Amino acid sequence: MSKPNHPRTLADSEAEAVLRNLRCSPRKLNVVAASIRNKPAGKAVADLTFSKRRIAKDVKKALESAIANAENNHQLDVDRLVVTTADVGRSIVMRRFHARGRGRAARVEKWFSHLRIVVAERDIETKADRRARRAAAKPAASASPAANEGVPA
């Protein structure tokens, strides 16, 4: 018996694309997926375009599909999209054998993967915004006299 399937429901500001049975091991695909997580969609597409990994082309297609779904099906602003999740899952493993010497055989496993990309509409924070936010939080922490008590002069 398998456990019941409860797909994650998407929010109104999210769109997804799913690729099934990609001919790449989940371990290798996860390296590429991790490189685009939490990035603005435009930057993620640019990174995948110039990636040297073979599977990056398929990941880019899935990301472009998610962006198109967001624009056409959910009427989201393309310039404000961020890759919120890029999930990699195991698919089938095709097993073959490789003939070896003295009548022996070695097992060859060809791994397949599933990929699910979710993009969401958010305000994209620039470096200047991030610096300003961190600068505003920093003086409050260092201004307290208790922080400097144990420091010899």
From Swiss-Prot:
Keywords assigned: Ribonucleoprotein, Ribosomal protein, RNA-binding, rRNA-binding
Disordered: annotated segments: 128-153
Biased composition (Low complexity): 137-147
Top-rank taxon: Bacteria
GO CC annotations on file: cytosolic large ribosomal subunit
Entries under CDD domains matching the protein: Ribosomal_L22
A Pfam family the protein falls into: Ribosomal_L22
Family matches, as InterPro entries: Ribosomal_uL22, Ribosomal_uL22_bac/chlpt-type, Ribosomal_uL22_bac/org-type, Ribosomal_uL22_CS, Ribosomal_uL22_sf
Annotated Gene3D superfamilies: Ribosomal protein L22/L17
GO biological-process terms attached to the record: translation
Keyword Membrane: no
Example of a GO MF term: rRNA binding
Role description: This protein binds specifically to 23S rRNA; its binding is stimulated by other ribosomal proteins, e.g. L4, L17, and L20. It is important during the early stages of 50S assembly. It makes multiple contacts with different domains of the 23S rRNA in the assembled 50S subunit and ribosome.
Family classification: Belongs to the universal ribosomal protein uL22 family.
PANTHER family: CHLOROPLAST 50S RIBOSOMAL PROTEIN L22-RELATED, LARGE RIBOSOMAL SUBUNIT PROTEIN UL22M
HAMAP family: Ribosomal_uL22_B (MF_01331_B)
Oligomer status and interactors: Part of the 50S ribosomal subunit.
Protein name: Large ribosomal subunit protein uL22
Species of origin: Acidiphilium cryptum (strain JF-5)
